[in-house]
Every structure is written in structure tokens, then in C-alpha cells.
């Protein structure tokens, strides 16, 4: 999904606002689920400027509801001073069936729910793409790097010959 920024303001109207690139390297993603995100006004503005970080974020359960923990959305600098905690838990909007499915996956050994990206849909709503993931060990990570390098070398050889 490509970022589309509105003219002079440089704000993201729809498209990817933040991405967790390290999650796809550290985990094997089994399935993905899209969830809504409850945000305050300044948090939305900060996201539209593309200033969020998901590298240390994770999703978990609290009181029967799913929350996004440790996602860094900094304070919006261009407006009225409104104090909020940049790493506060943010509620995820999911149906009960989806929550039960995710919690069932978490109960399995070694699986976790990680946020893969925050994006704005065509209607301008903030959404989080969650992945049900299984941790990788060092050997798996090395194999992924070797495979990626081989694909790059193969493409380079084909360009040179072809």
C-alpha cells in the first residue's frame, strides 16, 4: 500500500503510517488480522505525520479486551499542549470471535500477537495489521538471510545475462 500525502501539509491521508519491519524477520507470521485502533486527536495527527514506531510493540489481553502495548506514538508538536503518554496501551477494536481466536492462538506454545503495521484505510480510519506469529531461532534467521541473498544474486545474474 503506497503512502498518499496531501498537498502542502505532508499528512498521510491513507496508506502506511508505521511499519514493524523487524517483526517479519524475528517471527514467522502464521496469519494476519486487521483491527481498529482507539486513538485521541493528537495521536492521530502524530500518526498522519508518520512518526510512530512499532519495533517494540506487542498486542495482548486485559480484562477480556485486546490492547496494543508499548507502541510509540509521540506527542503532536503543532497544536495545543495536550499531555499523553507516548507508550500508553491503546485499545484494539475487534469482534469477540476474533479476540477469542487470537487468545486461543496465544495459548499455544511459542505463539504471540505482534503488530505488523499501522495504516489509514480509504475512509481515513487508523487500522492495525496484527500477525499471529511464532518466534524464529538463530538458524531460521540465518536461513532467511541466505535465501534472500541468493534471490538477490540470482536476479543480478539474470539481468547481466539477459
Swiss-Prot record:
Keywords: Cytoplasm, RNA-binding. It is found in: Cytoplasm. Gene3D superfamilies: 2.40.280.10. GO terms for molecular function: RNA binding. The keyword DNA-binding does not apply. GO terms for biological process: trans-translation. One of its GO terms (cellular component) is cytosol. It comes from the Bacteria. The keyword RNA-binding applies. Disulfide bonds: none annotated. Belongs to the SmpB family. HAMAP family: SmpB. NCBIfam families: PRK05422.1 (NF003843), smpB (TIGR00086). PANTHER family: SSRA-BINDING PROTEIN, TMRNA-BINDING COMPONENT OF TRANS-TRANSLATION TAGGING COMPLEX. Required for rescue of stalled ribosomes mediated by trans-translation. Binds to transfer-messenger RNA (tmRNA), required for stable association of tmRNA with ribosomes. tmRNA and SmpB together mimic tRNA shape, replacing the anticodon stem-loop with SmpB. tmRNA is encoded by the ssrA gene; the 2 termini fold to resemble tRNA(Ala) and it encodes a 'tag peptide', a short internal open reading frame. During trans-translation Ala-aminoacylated tmRNA acts like a tRNA, entering the A-site of stalled ribosomes, displacing the stalled mRNA. This is SsrA-binding protein. It comes from Granulibacter bethesdensis (strain ATCC BAA-1260 / CGDNIH1). The gene is smpB.
